[in-house]
Amino acid sequence: MDFGHILKSLVGMAKSDIEKKVEQQQTMSDRIVVDAVEVVEPFDFPPVDPGSIITLEKPAHFRLKMKRFTQLGSGNKRWYDAIMDVRFDKGFKTNGTSAPKIFNLQVPAYIAMTEKNANIYNAAAFIHDGLYACKGEIEEEGVPNAKNSKRRYTLSRIECDNILSEIWRKSDFVDSLTAKIGELGVNLFAGGEEHWDNDDLHCKTSFSAKIKYLK
């Protein structure tokens, strides 16, 4: 398969066509928009070659201000404001493989920590890898219209992919169209059993995510 040709074809598609494909896929689906990314505790790892396994030498913590379109309780689907706290323990490992390799030239899995906004950009693939390894399982707090306001919940693959491209956009390292192309590539090429619920690097025990809904 000529992956280079596939990449060029996708990049060459009109912006409206890309947006239409993603919109069609997400129609009536739960989805997430990230408004801001706060670096609470930055990443700390030594320089590595592309494709190598990264091991965090210190804990890291990121906070996402977000909107989530979903159904909570017995109400209809609507947008909810929320904060998502994502924590990585020391020793968390990732190689960015939940994002397809054919897009690495256009949207690299991670960038050198010396680059501008590297923490935010790298958080995209790191969080995505963690969510995929956990099969989207997170904690929820402050759940409206629910008897128990705290619970375990599973994000859909589309929501996890939303988070990936939304953080890419917030990093300003790639433009909105390129981020959307990257998300489409994840939808098309990285969605099977090979990555979803794949914890080959044993990062489930060193990754956690919690969404807190705002009143």
Predicted feature residues:
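Extended terminal accessory/targeting regions
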Residues: 2-215
